[in-house]
Amino acid sequence: MKLVLVNCGMAMGATTQSFDKHVLLRTHPFFKDLGDAVIDRLAPRVITTKVAKGAVIFRKGDVGSKLYAVRAGAVRISAPSEEGKDAIFNLVVPGELFGEIAFLDGGQRTADAVPIENCELMVIERRDFIPLIRDNPEVAIRLIKI
């Protein structure tokens, strides 16, 4: 199978260092403006899991109930093109998120997510995040601006 690289987001020289969940929540644009009280409520709900190289995290068409952040390793986001080639949309490295669109709208995944090396991921369940939005309308407003 031939790979086609499309808009690869991995920076030159990016490393696979680890990121703590509090650091990620306080510094990533998706979360940083949520405020300490919301982040302190969310952090205990973040789980850490290990995923082996080549294991499928999700496939195009799966329902998006989780948001992922890479803590260590790297994840390829891709989908088959009409020509049957695997088009790579992004390589997600430590400190970056993936799966946020389907996570927020509860819709279907638009691509596959597969680690290109052994990974450690931080995972937030939609069912844990939505009550924070419901209880804190300003959180929803901030997310809309992102």
Description of each model-found segment:
Residues 1-146:
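Cytosolic regulatory regions built on CNB/CRP/Popeye-like sensor folds
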